[in-house]
């Protein structure tokens, strides 16, 4: 630790600057890296959790005749491997989804998570996870079929909305509809099923998540032009 300068006013016309010496560290103080670091170093590579088939962020593609993880989140995983080992290949990708991402991180299946995860106070405190600096700023979005004929989410009164029990979208949707005095019909997607697939199968009028996630999802639709992001 370094010393700091403390200013103590004496009267209205003068100030005395006192140099405060740093206090000695407590006896037995020995800062160390956490268990995750030790595990990674012993293993020799980083296990990074990321989503599959998430265009622009993380997906496996054929690059120069070999399968390679590409996208923003996948590149962050690769950057961590370079920072730790100086080798971008010192990485193993583990596929996660909205329900398994925290479970895998907590039980040690993965060392780090890079998978479009909203930073919230409750997640930071309750799950006892260390969030790294934010890498992407986004907001809540909604996706609907173009045939619905709406141009604003405020026109979705009475809509059937698919959501999963995990993630922040459920509460975001609830808050949005309450704020604008709109009713909706919730359609909860069972564990193991995809909200996106429920929507494609016509089981709801819309679903919501981060706007970037919706753009990525729509890119993979058979007819992306038939869907609108609000």
Language model features: what each stretch is:
Residues 61-66, 78-89, 131, 169-190, ...:
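Ligand-binding cleft/hinge of the Venus flytrap
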Residues 119, 149, 168-169, 194, ...:
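Alpha-helix capping/helix-boundary segments
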Residues 46-47, 111-112, 204-206, 213:
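Short, Asp-centered acidic motifs that coordinate Mg2+ and/or phosphate
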Residues 55, 78, 82, 86-155, ...:
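Acidic, polar ligand-binding/catalytic clefts
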Residues 33, 90-103, 148, 184-201:
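Short helix-initiation/N-cap motifs at beta->coil->alpha
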Residues 30-33, 66-77, 94-98, 135-136, ...:
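Solvent-exposed, acidic/flexible segments
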Residues 1-92:
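N-terminal hydrophobic or amphipathic helices and topogenic motifs
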Residues 59-70, 90-91, 101-102, 158-163, ...:
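Second-shell loop/turn segments in exported
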């Amino acid at each position: 630790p370094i010393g700091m300068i403390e200013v103590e006013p004496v009267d209205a016309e003068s100030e005395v600057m006192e140099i405060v010496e740093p206090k000695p560290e407590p006896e037995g103080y020995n800062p160390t890296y956490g268990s995750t670091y030790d595990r990674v170093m012993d293993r020799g590579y980083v296990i990074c959790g990321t989503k599959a088939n998430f265009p622009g962020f993380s997906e496996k593609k054929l690059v120069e005749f070999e399968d390679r993880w590409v996208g923003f989140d996948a590149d962050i995983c690769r950057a961590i491997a370079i920072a730790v080992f100086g080798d971008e290949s010192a990485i193993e990708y583990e596929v996660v989804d909205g329900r398994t991402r925290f479970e895998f991180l907590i039980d040690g299946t993965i060392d780090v998570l890079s998978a479009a995860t909203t930073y919230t106070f409750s997640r930071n405190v309750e799950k006892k996870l260390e969030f790294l600096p934010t890498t992407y700023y986004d907001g809540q979005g909604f996706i609907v079929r173009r045939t619905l004929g709406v141009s604003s989410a405020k026109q979705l009164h009475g809509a059937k909305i698919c959501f999963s029990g995990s993630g922040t979208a459920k509460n975001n949707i609830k808050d949005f509809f309450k704020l604008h005095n709109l009713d909706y019909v919730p359609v909860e997607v069972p564990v193991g099923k995809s909200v996106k697939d429920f929507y494609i199968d016509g089981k709801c009028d819309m679903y919501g998540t981060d706007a970037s996630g919706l753009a990525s999802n729509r890119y993979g639709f058979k007819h992306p032009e038939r869907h609108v992001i609000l």
